[in-house]
């Protein structure tokens, strides 16, 4: 794919092998699939369902393909100021990704054929909606960002897709609806936080992240009071959401304090990359609470 100008290389390379693990977890687009699988596991626990492995596999593989496609589409405009290290990484390795993606896509089709019909139906509906989102974001004639924020769309779609494995197996959908809504708010908070931090501005919108994090934490406590105290799976979701909101609140405070003091572009690039990795790592909290429950 020809581009008008060469893209810069990754601005912040790992300084050690240990630090390289979370960096490449992010650059290889493995962060979103990991978060999706962990929260799908949480929803299954809250719904008291044994979700088939194939449904979780479809979620993880499908999420990876969508994020890779989204980042490759983003780099069609190499001079766009919103491009970050993850975009540069995908552009530099686009040939490998173009070779690997069809193989992964074939694997995904095989998994889809083997998944439960109800989950396949719900995933098909979400896939169609996701394609409309892709068109609205990436096709110039259909740009919808001005009247429907991209962060909100991503947050809602991500949460719904994550809930499908457990949701499709339930007879009583309202049992899980409040927890899915809570996670959708958390995903939207995550997306808005990343967007705000990467714009590197200390505008009034930057305070929105902290305010949203407080709202998410309060909603987690409210849901815990109403439902989460009854069973371990429901408690794990509420506790995970509260902890994630608290972590994002803390990261927002770190961004506002540290960024205003730093004047070196290279330091800022390293800092923003670390903050981006930490933002997604903040959503890995179900790993702790569910592991604690199963001990």
Q: Which residues are covered by each model-predicted region?
A:
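Catalytic cores of Mg2+-dependent Asp-rich isoprenoid enzymes
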Residues: 2-65, 85, 101-109, 179-182, ...
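Structural signal for the C-terminal ends of transmembrane alpha-helices
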Residues: 45-47, 112-116, 135-141, 166-170, ...
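Transmembrane alpha-helical segments that form the membrane-embedded catalytic/substrate-channel core
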Residues: 61-76, 128-140, 183-199, 244-256
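Solvent-exposed interhelical
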Residues: 65-99, 184-219
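Membrane-interface helix-boundary motifs at transmembrane edges
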Residues: 80-88, 113-119, 141-146, 171-174, ...
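Intramembrane alpha-helical segments
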Residues: 90-166
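Functional transmembrane core segments of multi-pass inner-membrane proteins
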Residues: 151-193, 199
